[in-house]
């Protein structure tokens, strides 16, 4: 790879599943189908929340943000994945790679923060139900969401800026499906200690702190639910949190594997380990956004009722 002072002249090559051409066709069809399901599921959920006034509450406001983040995240990476499966030379420009990495990292970091704010919302709703409308006012929950977005974007700017300063001498083969930051750091022909320190700080801010907020919130939530005398009351209270808790487990289970322990350039050379990490990252990047609308809507009477109302209104207007 030729490297000049102009970073846009640099090209990377994505390995993906190049060693398994038959699997590429299978994965292309599978990922395309999943991406369409992501757009459909999250698009419907966003539309329902926007157009049904009964869902104009803090919980659904955060859920709308979460769905929008899922659409943005997958749209920044899935088209590149699909194109790489079809292309003979799976190359991407340096600038294109950095843009894709920035968007993906920003959306992922923001989603971590949003999940933390959703836990706080459920904590207030269950532990302080009478004060909930006052504490979670429109100004409060909009500010919480805005803070999450700003944190995610700033964090991504910092990580991307540090990555762009690294020299890439000869090895330009990314052992991944997309321009994933850890895979790119492994290609640098310079000391990446600053990047590792920066990533560790990033993990603390957008992974550990939100997870602590979620954990502490649920400790108080469980304690409050256990004090509810009736079984029906306990079930109703827990049902409002079960979807969020399920998403948190899936989301953090995969993302911690990828980002909790940044590795130095020389620490991993195994091709098998690289492809396993890439597949887990693919699961995090595609499977989770596809499942989120299902998890939040299948057992949610409000969402199902809102969908029915919109469909009934559409059928009524079409019949006129």
Swiss-Prot record:
Q: Where are the transmembrane segments?
A: 26-46, 55-75, 100-120, 140-160, 198-217, 238-258, 278-298
Q: Which cysteines are joined by disulfide bonds?
A: 97-189
Record: glycosylation sites? 5
What cellular component terms from Gene Ontology apply here? plasma membrane
InterPro entries annotated for this entry? GPCR_Rhodpsn, GPCR_Rhodpsn_7TM, Olfact_rcpt
Q: Where in the cell is it found?
A: Cell membrane
The reply to whether Disulfide bond figures as a keyword in the UniProt entry is: yes
Give UniProt keywords alphabetically: Cell membrane, Disulfide bond, G-protein coupled receptor, Glycoprotein, Membrane, Olfaction, Receptor, Sensory transduction, Transducer, Transmembrane, Transmembrane helix
Extracellular compartment ranges equal: 1-25, 76-99, 161-197, 259-277
Q: What does this protein do?
A: Odorant receptor.
Name of the featured protein: Olfactory receptor 13C8
User: Organism source for this protein?
Assistant: Homo sapiens
């Amino acid at each position: 790879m030729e490297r000049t002072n102009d970073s846009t002249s640099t090209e990377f090559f994505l390995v993906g599943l190049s060693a398994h051409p038959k699997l590429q066709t299978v994965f292309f069809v599978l990922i395309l189908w999943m991406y369409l399901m992501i757009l459909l599921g999250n698009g419907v959920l966003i539309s329902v929340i926007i157009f049904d006034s009964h869902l104009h509450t803090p919980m659904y406001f955060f859920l709308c943000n979460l769905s929008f983040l899922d659409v943005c995240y997958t749209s920044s990476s899935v088209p590149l994945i699909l194109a790489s499966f079809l292309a003979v030379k799976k190359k991407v420009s340096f600038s294109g790679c950095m843009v894709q990495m920035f968007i993906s990292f920003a959306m992922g970091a923001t989603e971590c923060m949003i999940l933390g704010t959703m836990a706080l919302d459920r904590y207030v709703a269950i532990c302080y139900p009478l004060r909930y409308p006052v504490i979670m006012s429109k100004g409060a929950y909009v500010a919480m969401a805005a803070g999450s977005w700003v944190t995610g974007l700033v964090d991504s700017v910092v990580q991307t800026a540090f990555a762009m300063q690294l020299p890439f001498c000869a090895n330009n083969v990314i052992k991944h499906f997309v321009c994933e930051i850890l895979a790119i750091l492994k290609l640098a022909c310079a000391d990446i200690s600053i990047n590792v320190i920066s990533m560790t700080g990033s993990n603390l801010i957008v992974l550990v702190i939100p997870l602590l907020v979620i954990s502490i919130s649920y400790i108080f939530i469980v304690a409050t639910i256990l004090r509810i005398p009736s079984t029906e009351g306990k079930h109703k209270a827990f049902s409002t949190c079960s979807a969020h808790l399920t998403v948190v487990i899936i989301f953090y289970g995969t993302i911690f594997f990828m980002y909790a322990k940044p590795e130095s350039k020389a620490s991993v050379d195994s091709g098998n380990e690289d492809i396993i990490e890439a597949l887990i990252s693919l699961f995090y990047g595609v499977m989770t956004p596809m499942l989120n609308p299902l998890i939040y809507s299948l057992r949610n009477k409000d969402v199902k009722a809102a969908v029915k109302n919109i469909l009934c209104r559409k059928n009524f207007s079409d019949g006129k």
